[in-house]
From Swiss-Prot:
Compartments, record wording: Cytoplasm
GO annotation terms (biological process): modification-dependent protein catabolic process; proteasomal protein catabolic process
Name listed for the protein in its UniProt record: Proteasome subunit beta
InterPro entries in UniProt: Ntn_hydrolases_N, Proteasome_sua/b, Proteasome_suB-type, PSB_actinobac
Similarity remark: Belongs to the peptidase T1B family.
Keyword Protease: yes
EC id: 3.4.25.1
Function in brief: Component of the proteasome core, a large protease complex with broad specificity involved in protein degradation.
Organism: Geodermatophilus obscurus (strain ATCC 25078 / DSM 43160 / JCM 3152 / CCUG 61914 / KCC A-0152 / KCTC 9177 / NBRC 13315 / NRRL B-3577 / G-20)
Amino acid sequence: MSEYSAGRSGFSPAYLDRVGSSFTDFLAAAAPHLLPGSRPVPQIPVGNVTPHGTTIVSVTYDGGVLMGGDRRATMGNLISSREIEKVYPADAWSVIGIAGAAGIAIEMVRLYQVELEHYEKIEGLTLSLDGKANRLAQMIRGNLGAALQGLAVVPLFAGFDLDAAPGAAPGRIFSYDVTGGNYEERGYSAVGSGSLFARNSLKKTWRPNLDGDAATRSLVEALYDAADDDSATGGPDPVRRLYPIVYRVDAEGAVRVPDDEIAAVATRITDERSAADGQG
């Protein structure tokens, strides 16, 4: 008799035993082969034959937090995609951006979204922002074996803290390393191949208590500067009408900033720099 037909219910015992509010723990008990980090990988480096997402940037502002990512994925020295989306809503109050092995990263994001939804259904309440950050750290740690073979996933996580103390900034950002260590960032952060250039740009344009428009400009300009110096980061592409994916998370929740708004910001940056070059 198949393990899935065991018992009168027709379900495996793993489906009937309550393993807690973690969907990842349930999956580990019921179907561990479906977890991203549990699959065998070749004992050779495979980093140059899989698409990799590149640069993700996040900045806080006076009403919350923004996160954006470019649209390029690379495979070694080749551009494997110009239209990949790297920033996703994790739930109603948080977002996640991916850098690293794109296939595994996207699968991890989907599992993480289910993880947060499962917790809310089981417990009847939303996990705290710190709790969400810690859950993501556990999932990254589970991918360590694949990371050591070149299939690393290094996300950036940000959200609106519903439990923020009066006077404290509600927008918060968390970065990670491949071992699952998570670190809260102050003000802004960036991950991926162009992160060094993005951070250098943010040092000049970001300041505390920016309004939403200024923060959006700072973020898009950071991605523009990253693309200028990093071949794996794609800049705004008006010919194909491809612009960074940007999400805003504030007291109203997580929403995607319309492409037309991002296009207008990118156009202003390009026009201003073109005018400055002409005067030089």
